[in-house]
Amino acid sequence: MILIAIEEAIARYKGIVVNRHADMISSLSSGMTNIIKDILKISIIIVSYSWLVENISLYKIEQLWVVVLCALVVQDFTGYWLHRLNHRVNIFWNRHVIHHSSEEFNLSCALRQSISQTFNYAAILMIPAAVFGIPAYIFAILGPIHLFMQFWYHTRLIDKLGILEYILVTPSHHRVHHAINPEYIDKNYSQIFIVWDKLFGTFQEELSEVKPVYGTLTPASTWNPIIINFKHLWQLLKDSWNTKNLIDKLRIWFMPTGWRPDDVKLKYPIEKILNPYDQKKYNPYNPRNFVIFSWIEYFVASAMMFHLFILFDNQTMNLNYLYGAYIFVYIFIYSSILDNKKSFKIYGLIKLFLFSSILLYQNVSWFGLSFEMTILFGSYILLSSLIPIFINK
């Protein structure tokens, strides 16, 4: 949040608009859902790296610096191919579409991380590291560092960086990656070292005469990060069901991203951007009171997330899942309000009903809060549930 605030301050000083309130709330909320999913361990590991090391290791590198260097190279190489697969195959795109859904390019959009990565198969691409006996704990330490090193280059404020452009992934390289211009699309998959794109033919330099246009060719058209996470999957399911071609029912999942059977493409057309330079950013009308209310709700959801972290080891996993699910619903509701659709007025009542049900289930105690704090929090939930009914458009 500090770095995002610094980026916003510098942008304002330079007279550049890099953030929109609704877009930022959507991005930060997406990051929150990803964190909750991770701590609840809602994923299936196809094969673990620890198992690979224990069963196929043929040699053990002794020098620590060599181990760390090899691990970094393997992590980055694996990241390149996972990233490329996520872009190029229909079923895998659903795991990554949330990250590209913003029509802005800023530090907050880096937090748009997936909750739809149900199956984890990354270890399969790390077999060379397992053969050489690189310990699993090295990747456990290196993984978060490697991920954080991908945060800084999601910005429009940093120009090209001289000699570093030939070595590292820079903001310029990653602007290309997030762009939907014909010159840029499906380029620059590298995560730390740009060498992989140059080696495998997917590198594209940012051109001074081609300004990047950000987003996806099939626009998200919502601020709700949970809907965005599963929108592509829902489209695949519908197309697989609706097509009359039995082969297409199966192959749609493994075809290039965006491919649809001919019969459903004609019968059920979907919105696509044919000319990026004519892009009209998703921007439903949001009065100031909508925005203020959604920011308050975001911070309340953040407080609940931290409360869940504090409680995590002191309550049953069933209660952890229940609390996590409620926070997901909470995020779904306040982010939907920013879409300004007629249905948003009933969302507050749903939130109130779920809160009341959980409260009764826990004998009028909100996940370990004192009676007084439960009453205080419940009063806020009641008030915030009624606000959408009376809030003016």
PLM regions: where:
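Juxtamembrane "helix exit" motif at the C-terminal ends of alpha-helical transmembrane segments
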Residues: K41-K60, I124-F139, G143, V300-L319, ...
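Loop-to-helix transition at the N-terminal end of transmembrane alpha-helices
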Residues: V18-I35, M317-A325
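Short, charged cytosolic
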Residues: M1-I6, I16, R84-V97, R251-N275
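Membrane interfacial helix-start motif at the N-side
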Residues: M32, F105-I115, L274-S294
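Membrane-embedded catalytic scaffold of the fatty acid hydroxylase/desaturase
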Residues: S29-K41, I61-P225
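Membrane-interface helix-loop junction between the first two transmembrane segments
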Residues: A5-I25
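Substrate-recognition/cap regions that form aromatic- and gly/pro-loop-enriched pockets
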Residues: N283-L369, M373-I391
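A membrane-cytosol interface segment of integral membrane proteins
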Residues: K211-W259
